[in-house]
């Protein structure tokens, strides 16, 4: 019944060939127009998991409550903390004026509130120490505030040397500051880009990268009609940084990360090189088709059939899922790789029949008769393999399976309608030579003669490698699927190195402030937790004592910071004289002494002497290098001395909105201890937090849950694929033994594929795990072709035209998968790599293992025709 139906379809298609082709072209054009109107890609990796899962619902609720998805984090990095803060303040002010691209712009951990209240967040003893240092520095601050120039700086230096004479400090204690100043002067003299931080000078610990960063949180207005909805916003930020001369004035750079830039660059990474790879793939596929078919007319027919099918599949896919995702977009490559298989199988069968009969229409009908069962069974099995993803919670692959499954049905239908019609219209020349591979006769005989040894050896190798699967691991971190070369990911990876940035934070929602405090207290006791943060964190403890210390310091320091008058700017000659005077004072201080302090004094004296002997422009540059950050620090110091009590009631609204929802829920942020870049550390951290607070969400918790979901989906899809394909095979073949002959080589290929993955250190991940259930659908097609030929009594299968069709079909599929391997996107590339590997093992199983496993047919075809 199936055979007669397909033969009837082929007869009708060739009888009305022009009409059939016209309908196919019309549908392809209409589908292309629909695709043009509705094409879209959702690049958000979070949407690859079903939103119906409990943990995903919590993630989504949290993201909506705090608008986390629509976020750009601008990271301002400068050579000094002063310039990082100044550049961020300038950029924040500029972006706040833009109501076209941004809904809101705010500083994180900076701005007026933190400038004024910064001292309150220090421990009480550190506040006392800082205010004490302020009072000791009054004479120096008074000089520099009243004369912010080279003259004032050198005067402050000489005042400090007086303290050295009095024994208030040792010469060696000056080694660090003197060397730091000397190095900066040397950079100026060497015409290098020079920067100086007064904060770094007085800080006992070296400045970290985190000290020299400032953050701006931007909520952009997204254009969802564009393929990159946030591109206008990110472009506006970058242009603002250029217009403000952030790099020239502050030596700063602005990098963007967060969901919006990551999504933008994710799409850019996917399309990067896609055109070149696509063209290369087409060229190679055409070359393979030529080697398989040796006829430009047949190649044109197969290629045209493929284009028509792909156009229709794309439109149908968009109808099914609205927009493609980063995994489902691979359907096009899968369609080319697998859809062309049907075309090659039918065309090679047609060529074989044309060689025997010489009549075009008769050859097409006979090709349909011979191909009907294996081709339709292969199409159904491949479709079943793809559709096995539908019941899973891994939405990204579920949608890929849905589209690719529809694509296989479309490819099969066009291969028995449009392709025969095209061949009828094009009327390729007859075949003069048989299509089999007679040179493979020795291999056929070897497989037959050593059948038992090959079966035992192959299964033995597969079984011996099973212990390797213990070392197979799943890389559950989706960040590893993204290119570390793009700015947004490179920035995120840099931030992740700093445990204080919260890049690996987990969040817990508390119903109220008291519950938040209880959750904080419980989680803070976990060894896997380094610290917790909530709204209460922004209300410093011990404020009365700290405010008294600050007020006492302000009484002494404010007059020095705000002199009644500022000295007129010095002349260049004044600066030269002051430099020489300070150099001489440094040499006197060093005297004949040895040690780091004396060496540093002489080094600084030499640098100041050289600066005095340089041109005026060099001295003006040096003055700018030291004075600009000094004035910024003085302004910050003035603000810090104005600290006022901080309560939950007077916290800035932008801080409150980041930690408290409108209905009163409080966010508790939990940061991990240990190496934040270690997957095992993050897994233990997430597990510990979940055990204490099962409703925790975000960060490593979401990553851990995603990994569990995907592994479960893979197992579920694999079982569904195996079950559905087995049922299809049994319905068609009606023999359990024949079903086993089809599936055993497939399972062996699957086991060997995983074993090789361990040996070449190719872990499974969110993207490439798709290859394994697909292996069932793809690989079973080749097995079906051999089993159906074997059941019909054919022998010497390697010498047949069937092997030619399978070999070149596999080559085209490998080429399509190889194009994925060459992708700039790490996730897509890993998927292509594993697909290509699985195809290689599958081809080896079908060409070498399966003939030995099948042995001689039950009923041998005595015709002796190997050109099948």
UniProtKB/Swiss-Prot annotation:
TM regions (residue ranges): 16-36, 273-293, 298-318, 326-346, 370-390, 403-423, 452-472, 710-730, 740-760, 762-782, 805-825, 834-854
Main localization, broad class: membrane
Disruption phenotype: Deletion mutant no longer contains any hopanoids in the outer membrane, and contains elevated concentrations of hopanoids in the cytoplasmic and inner cytoplasmic membrane fractions. Total hopanoid abundance is unchanged. Deletion mutant grows like the wild-type strain and forms single cells when grown at 30 degrees Celsius, but grows slower and shows a filamentation phenotype at 38 degrees Celsius, suggesting that cell division is affected.
Keyword list, A-Z: Cell inner membrane, Cell membrane, Lipid transport, Membrane, Transmembrane, Transmembrane helix, Transport
Matching InterPro entries: Hopanoid_biosynth_HpnN (IPR017841), MMPL_dom (IPR004869), Mycobact_MmpL (IPR050545), SSD (IPR000731)
Keyword Translocase: no
BP-aspect Gene Ontology terms: lipid transport
Domain SSD: 299-425
Subcellular location: Cell inner membrane
CC terms in the record's Gene Ontology section: cell outer membrane; plasma membrane
Entry membrane topology: Multi-pass membrane protein
Family named by the database record: Belongs to the resistance-nodulation-cell division (RND) (TC 2.A.6) family. MmpL subfamily.
Role this protein plays: Essential for hopanoid transport from the cytoplasmic to the outer membrane. Required for the C(35) hopanoid, bacteriohopanetetrol, to remain localized to the mother cell type.
Protein name according to UniProt: Hopanoid transporter HpnN
């Amino acid at each position: 019944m199936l055979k007669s139906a397909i033969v009837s379809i082929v007869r009708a298609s060739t009888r009305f060939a022009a009409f059939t082709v016209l309908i196919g072209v019309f549908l392809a054009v209409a589908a292309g127009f629909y695709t043009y109107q509705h094409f879209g890609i959702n690049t958000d990796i979070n949407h690859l998991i079903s939103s119906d899962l409990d943990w995903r619902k919590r993630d989504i609720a949290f993201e909506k409550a705090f608008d986390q998805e629509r976020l750009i984090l601008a990271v301002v990095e400068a050579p000094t903390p002063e310039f990082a803060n100044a550049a961020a303040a300038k950029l924040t002010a500029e972006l706040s004026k833009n109501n076209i691209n941004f809904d809101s712009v705010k500083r994180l951990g900076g701005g007026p509130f933190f400038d004024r209240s910064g001292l309150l967040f220090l421990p009480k003893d550190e506040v006392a120490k800082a205010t004490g240092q302020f009072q000791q520095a009054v004479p120096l601050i008074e000089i520099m505030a009243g004369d912010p120039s080279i003259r004032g700086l050198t005067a402050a230096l000489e005042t400090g040397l007086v303290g050295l004479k009095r024994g208030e400090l040792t010469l060696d204690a000056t080694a660090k500051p003197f060397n730091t100043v000397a190095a900066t002067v040397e950079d100026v003299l060497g015409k290098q880009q020079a920067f100086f931080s007064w904060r770094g000078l007085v800080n006992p610990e070296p400045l970290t990268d985190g000290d020299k960063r400032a953050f701006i949180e931007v909520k952009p207005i997204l254009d969802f009609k564009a393929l990159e909805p946030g591109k206008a916003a990110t472009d506006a930020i970058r242009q603002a940084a250029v217009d403000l001369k952030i790099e020239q004035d502050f030596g700063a750079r602005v990098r963007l990360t967060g969901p919006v830039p990551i999504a933008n660059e994710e799409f850019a990474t996917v399309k990067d090189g896609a055109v070149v790879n696509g063209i290369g793939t087409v060229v190679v596929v055409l070359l393979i088709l030529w080697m398989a078919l040796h006829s430009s007319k047949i190649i044109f027919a197969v290629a045209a059939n493929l284009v028509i099918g792909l156009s229709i599949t794309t439109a149908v896919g968009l109808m099914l899922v609205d927009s493609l995702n980063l995994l489902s977009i691979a359907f096009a490559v899968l369609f080319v790789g697998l859809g062309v298989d049907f075309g090659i199988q039918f065309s090679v069968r047609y060529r074989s029949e044309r060689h025997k009969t010489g009549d075009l229409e008769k050859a097409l009908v006979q090709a349909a008769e011979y191909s009907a069962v294996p081709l339709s069974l292969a199409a159904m099995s491949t479709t079943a393999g793809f559709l096995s993803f539908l019941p899973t919670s891994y939405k990204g692959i579920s949608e890929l399976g849905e589209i690719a499954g529809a694509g296989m049905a479309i490819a099969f239908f066009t291969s028995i309608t449009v392709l025969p019609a095209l061949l009828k219209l094009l009327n390729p020349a007859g075949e003069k030579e048989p299509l089999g591979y007679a040179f493979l006769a020795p291999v056929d005989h070897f497989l037959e003669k050593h059948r038992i040894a090959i079966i035992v050896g192959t299964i033995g190798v597969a079984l011996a490698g099973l212990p390797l699967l213990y070392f197979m691991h799943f890389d559950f971190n989706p960040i590893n699927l993204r290119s570390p070369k793009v700015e947004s990911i490179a920035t995120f990876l840099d931030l992740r190195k700093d445990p204080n940035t919260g890049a690996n934070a987990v969040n817990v929602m508390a119903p109220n402030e008291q519950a938040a405090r209880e959750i904080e207290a419980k989680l803070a006791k976990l060894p896997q937790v380094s610290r917790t943060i909530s709204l209460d964190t922004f209300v410093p403890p011990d404020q009365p004592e700290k405010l008294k210390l600050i007020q006492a310091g302000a009484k002494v320091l404010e007059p020095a910071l705000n002199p009644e008058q500022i000295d007129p700017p010095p002349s260049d000659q004044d600066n030269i004289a002051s430099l020489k005077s300070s150099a001489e004072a440094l040499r006197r201080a060093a005297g004949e002494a040895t040690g780091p302090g004396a060496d540093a004094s002489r080094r600084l004296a030499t640098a100041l002497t050289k600066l005095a002997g340089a041109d005026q422009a060099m001295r003006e540059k040096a003055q700018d290098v030291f004075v600009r950050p000094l004035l910024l620090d003085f302004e910050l110091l003035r603000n810090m001395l104005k600290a006022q009590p901080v309560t939950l009631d007077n916290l800035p609204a932008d801080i409150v909105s980041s930690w408290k929802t409108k209905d009163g829920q409080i966010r508790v942020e939990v940061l991990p201890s240990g190496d934040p870049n270690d997957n095992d550390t993050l897994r233990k951290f997430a597990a510990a937090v979940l055990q204490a607070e099962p409703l925790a969400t975000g960060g490593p918790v979401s990553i851990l849950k995603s990994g569990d979901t995907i592994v479960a989906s893979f197992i579920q899809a694999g079982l569904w694929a195996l079950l559905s394909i087995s049922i299809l095979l049994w319905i068609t073949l009606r023999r359990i033994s024949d079903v086993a002959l089809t599936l055993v080589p497939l399972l062996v290929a699957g086991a060997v594929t995983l074993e090789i993955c361990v040996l070449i250190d190719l872990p499974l991940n969110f993207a490439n795990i798709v290859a394994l259930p697909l292996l069932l659908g793809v690989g079973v097609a080749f097995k079906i072709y051999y089993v159906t030929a074997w059941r019909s009594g054919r022998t010497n299968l390697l010498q047949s035209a069937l092997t030619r069709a399978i070999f070149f079909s596999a080559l085209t599929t490998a080429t399509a998968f190889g194009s994925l391997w060459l992708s700039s996107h790490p996730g897509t590339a890993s998927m292509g790599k594993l697909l290509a590997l699985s195809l290689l093992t599958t081809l080896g199983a079908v060409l070498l293992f399966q003939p030995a496993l099948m042995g001689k047919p039950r009923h041998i075809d005595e015709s002796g025709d190997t050109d099948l």
